[in-house]
Curated annotation (Swiss-Prot):
Organism expressing this protein natively: Actinobacillus pleuropneumoniae serotype 3 (strain JL03)
Subcellular locations according to the entry: Cytoplasm
Its biological purpose: Catalyzes the formation of acetyl phosphate from acetate and ATP. Can also catalyze the reverse reaction.
Transmembrane regions: none
Database matches in InterPro entries: Ac/propionate_kinase, Aliphatic_acid_kin_short-chain, Aliphatic_acid_kinase_CS, ATPase_NBD
Listed GO MF terms: acetate kinase activity; ATP binding; magnesium ion binding
Binding-site positions, Mg(2+): N10, E389
Subunit structure: Homodimer.
Name this protein carries in UniProt: Acetate kinase
Amino acid sequence: MSKNLILILNCGSSSLKFAVLDPKTGDEKLSGLAEAFNLEDARIKWKLHGEKGNADLGAGAAHSEALTFIANELLSEELKSSIGAIGHRIVHGGEQFTSSVVINDDVVKGIEHAIQFAPLHNPAHLIGIKEAFRIFPELKEKNVAVFDTAFHQTMPEEAFLYALPYKLYKEHGIRRYGAHGTSHLFITSQVAELAGKPVDQTNAIICHLGNGGSVSVVRNGKCIDTSMGLTPLEGLVMGTRSGDIDPAIVFYLYKNLGMSMEQIEDTLVKKSGLLGLTEVTSDCRYAEDNYEDASKPEAKRALDVYSYRLAKYIGAYMAILGDDHLDAIAFTGGIGENSGHVRELALNHLKLFGVKLDVERNLAARFGKSGVITADDSTFKAVVIPTNEELVIAQDTAKLAL
């Protein structure tokens, strides 16, 4: 039987997303999520050949138990024998990795070195790699690391450097790395297709908006700047992350309010963003649904700050492109694909650039539907394109390991 399928693993600190894909057609044979690791109610849910299912993994279960369940309970002998390689999503590759690579000892060491920049994600990725080696020994030489930071490695020095003592970059690697690169790469290819141009002639501003969010600007198919920084904390307002703040706020919280560094980190990473602004939830839908409700001013407050910050980044990146033609402003991710309200608020800030929203088109482009959302006489096109990070991981893995 032909080994033409790819098993995709996206290991988080307390969850594991998985899928089995055909890299040529994008046909999804299996997808699912194992979650609540190390808790009493660790569980797994899946969709196999169109049929949904779920199960308990047992109290305290984690990556090992989840992968064992996938291999023994979900993968039939026929499906298992069709898997030719395993693709791992890796959040941070530092400067070492500029593209996807077959995993060996040196790659593992590189992922370990980048733990300092992704302390929650990279250790989980390493567990996933170790468990994949154990459970699928016949595919040990066919594991591929696909890095979220790789797409952004084409940024010029003026974009990735911070105005800190230069030795902090040279000696410690402190610079902008970005994230969501796999999504930004996929959307770049889709904008090129929409524009009828080769990727290496495509210019775009891509807004990946989900619980985490980032904007990137692409010139001739290559990223030249992005909003996330050394870590995914910088940039846009996010679900629970603050995004850009005055760094001196950290000193103030420490010196004046007596907060510990752990408390400050917890505040900026887990208690800010939409959650902090609403004081209710990190879910953007709450802010949308209650935007006009005068009794819930927190909803309007949160969505206005969110969309204003987004518009600032889009406008700045339009300026950076200069004389280069902008093929599209693209929205993707859970919020980018489904929130017509966020798109409307953000694009209305860009009227100076001649951006003109078409209200009906904007409302139609939701729930998996793509399309142009600007008017025919708009100076620039804005489009909605559902992302497909799993397909990019599958295709990169197939190129290197099949």
